[in-house]
Amino acid sequence: MNVPAPPLRLAEAAGVLSLATDLAMGQPLEHGLRTAVLALRTARAMGLSEDEQVTVYYTGLLHFAGCTAESEIDARFFGNEMAARPRMMTVARGSRLELVATAMRTAHAGSAPLARAAMMARAAFGGIAEFRKWAASHCDVARLLGSRMGLSGPVQQALRHLYERWDGNGMPGELRGAQLPLAVRLMQVAQDADVACQYGGPALAAGTLTRRAGSGLDPDAVRIFLSLGDAPYKGLDAPSIWDDAMDAEPGPQPVAAGARLDECLSAMADFADLKSIQRLYRKTGLSTRAGATLFAPSTGSSGGQASDLCRRAR
């Protein structure tokens, strides 16, 4: 008897992906979940509509969704990308001086002096172009992933502008101020707050957000977040907030089933393979071959069995 695969909540799929991106970006597990919850609590305090809250929630979960696309650039620029990423996260929306100084201290740390000197010369002449390429590839992959997962147009639009800044000095530098989607502005405040909390709790987060208000961050979003005191952080120090993050999803809680589920899983598989260009579409190809084998006349297998094996292969 064939039992069809149960539908999958899109929030669960996005949540699983956010856990993977936490690891890929060198962040503590559930950073993405905490970012989504912090941003959503701010959105609710602002009285945003349910649809707007949905966009904020999924933007928070998937703000690292394009991280595998930048691996090659990160490795070329920094050497040890996994050591560099968490350090760069602490200054991503800081001042230009903070960003450049941290990049110089981090890039190819431990290498011979001549090698580091060559890297610094290259960074001085091509660093900005490299980072623009980095941001564009990350955002393009994130938007495409959101599309293939069946997320709404506003979510996909937000995922295109993850690395823009309030002052217009972000990447790729196309938007500034209120031109940035509100979901992105709230996500950025929440992300910076969570990263700072890892090092010094809400007090350090408040100082960090205050310094960046009006430059890297939306000053109104910072003001509203800080006006809530410690309330946004309530319960986020638990060993795991998975259940709370899933329960927090606003709106009708959409699911993926059948062909939509297959496309969602294929998108997640391609995301994983993008870490290495040599492995691109490997998981998708594996699942296709698995299905072809099961559909061979000699196997006598049903379509349901083939679909199940394809999902397992991904």
Regions found by a protein language model. Name each.
Residues 2-314:
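Histidine- and acidic-residue-rich, metal-dependent catalytic cores
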